[in-house]
Amino acid sequence: MKFKLKRIDWYIIKQFLGTYIFAIALIIAISVVFDINEKIDKFLSPDVPLKAIVFDYYMNFIQYFANLFSPLFTFIAVIFFTSKLADNSEVIAMLASGMSFRRLMLPYAISAGIIALSTFVLNAYIIPPANATRIDFQNKYIKNKKVDYVRSAQLEIEPGVIAYFDRYDARSGMGYRFSLEHFENKKMISRLTANSIKYDSLYNWTLIDYMIRDFDGMREHITEGSRMDTTLTIVPSDFLISVNDCETMTSSELSTYIDRQKKRGIGNIQTFQIEYHKRFAAIMAAFILTSIGASLSSRKIKGGMGLNIGIGLALSFSYILFTTVTSTFAINGNLSPAMAAWIPNILYTFIAIYLYRKAPR
């Protein structure tokens, strides 16, 4: 059976998306004003070009925060315009004309689908390169959060080949107390050590004051030297990991990076895994929060629109808070990144089902 969209459907879709865009514009405008006020001292520096502030920072700042709080804007939009419809008795008129609440939800679902698809495309492909530009600006002119120093970095660069840096400084491109161990059938067959190692270019390194020990049964062959150029399938970015790095990768890059780091035995990748799963969880969040908002605000109540908006804001902020809490547990506890991303959606799905059943018929 085909559903033909009626004038009322287009009216609801227009109201939904219009209110959503208005909410984004309003909140982002306020956020930009507060951000300028906070960073005005940095921006007034003669070293910071106005063009970079506008195009490298704020153009990308707006995209990032608009998409980050998309669930909140979706919820506010639904609550606001549905409460207005209910307050004007328009919802009652629709239901009295024979339209079921389920049918009434169709334009809401279409609008949520448009927002969900837009959010996914932005998250997966458009915002990551924009974030790279924004974060580069922040690191250069505001506060450098880029990781350029690491201690005790160990990773498996190939099956049975373990590399270890006691410390590495990206500013000089130098690593210290480096070792490279080769294993076959769980037995060490060679061990290379160097007082220092310098990164040259992609996979090209220079060993300084090195020693190679090759094991052949009970025999040991030692080779020493002051300098040697070699090729290692690692680059500094493999172990110089910043929390912000996950925001600069497209979803395909994120998936490839996670798989590569897992194979190399690097453990601190929970933030990257959470970011990857969140991008898919955000698709469902648009539908869940739309259902909650429509079900909650479609009934005309004594408190009017203000009460509905208050309840809606409380629920939306609790959703964001719950998402933050589960992410923290995944990073610092035993909760899996996939569960951390999806638990808020699962919980709020039950809330959506309950409110849907209680909605006016």
Regions found by a protein language model. Give the residues of each.
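Transmembrane alpha-helices
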Residues: 1-159, 170, 218, 236-361
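Generic detection of short hydrophobic beta-strand segments and adjacent strand-loop junctions
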Residues: 3, 220-234
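Structural signature for solvent-exposed beta-strand/loop edge elements and short helix-capping sites
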Residues: 157-210
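A short, polar/proline- and glycine-enriched secondary-structure boundary/capping micro-motif
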Residues: 187-190, 216-226
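Short C-terminal domain-edge/linker segments immediately following a structured domain
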Residues: 195-198, 209-213, 228-229, 237-242, ...
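A short, charged
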Residues: 199-221, 241-249
